[in-house]
Amino acid sequence: MSKISRRDFLKVTGIAAAAAALTACGGSSSTASSTASSAAASPEVVKKLDKISVAVPNDTTNEARALALLEKNGFFKVKADAGLTATKNDIEENPFNVNIDEVEAAQVPSVLQDEDYAVINSNYAISAGLNPVEDALAIEDGSSAYVNVLVCKDGNQESPKIKALAAALESQQVKDFIDEKYAGSVVFVVENPTDGYDSTVDYDALNGETVSCAATPAPHCEILEICKDILAQKGITLDIQEFDDYIQPNNVVEDGQIDTNYFQHQPYLDDFNQEHGTHLVTVAGIHVEPMGIYGGKQDSLAPIEG
């Protein structure tokens, strides 16, 4: 999908009038600007809002992550002991009367126009045509505990074809692709990238084999396409199975339908195993997708900075 600006994104999701009033590059606002647009442009008006609405992902680890980012940017304070399972019920100081709306992670971009702000995972922001580096009002840095991982069922970690896929994902070729394609929206975290291959794997024995991987569209499937080319040079087929949710990619690996998955960060995997009784383990940590705060009805963080 080609990237569109935040203004164009909001326009196609139903608030063209508000977006048009927030013209860039020194342009003046239309005298016919809506009340919502005027409020977004004027801190004096914004400060009088009764509450500020923020959409966040509703799964445990991503909600806690979103709340931590909001807290860091001054929206409220969360109980010190809430940790990686914090929910909106753990907010203890809320001077701006922030109302948290919990939404399924993939759907958060679709409600952006209805909220003052939304906290969106980078993969879903990218899929929605947003550029996390350019469009987010605030964004995590790359030093995050939320590393996206390659996962298999416990007991299969030493499978040669899974090790071959891990080496491809940890490669310099993947690093170069991520750096060029995403320019900070996705951050490669492997300290010593491989040449695409694992010296302990007998690639001749894998010639003609297939390794399957469940993944979400962007950036995971796009990154796996680089791995497909790397593995093809050794006669290995990478079967990429695309999913749009955060549940089935784990279920199909747990029941043996698919060898691996690549879509989730480590805290989500840990929480999923605990909640569902699955036996999934990390093979390799590949990248971080910095979570960002995006403006819907508001175009800056002025309402919480005054």
Q: Which residues does each predicted region cover?
A:
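Short helix-initiation/N-cap motifs at beta->coil->alpha
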Residues: 82-110, 240-251
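Short, polar/charged alpha-helical segment
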Residues: 68-75, 86-89, 217-248, 252
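Ligand-binding clefts/hinges and TM-proximal coupling segments of bilobed small-molecule sensing domains
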Residues: 65, 79-86, 163-202
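C-terminal motif of bacterial Sec signal peptides marking the signal peptidase cleavage site
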Residues: 21-24
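A conserved helix-loop-strand patch within extracytoplasmic ligand-binding domains
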Residues: 40-69, 73, 163, 171-176, ...
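Short, well-ordered beta-strand elements
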Residues: 50-55, 206-218, 236-242
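Periplasmic-binding protein-like
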Residues: 126-158, 190-198, 283-295
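Extended ligand-binding regions for polar small-molecule ligands
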Residues: 141-142, 147-181, 297-300, 304-306
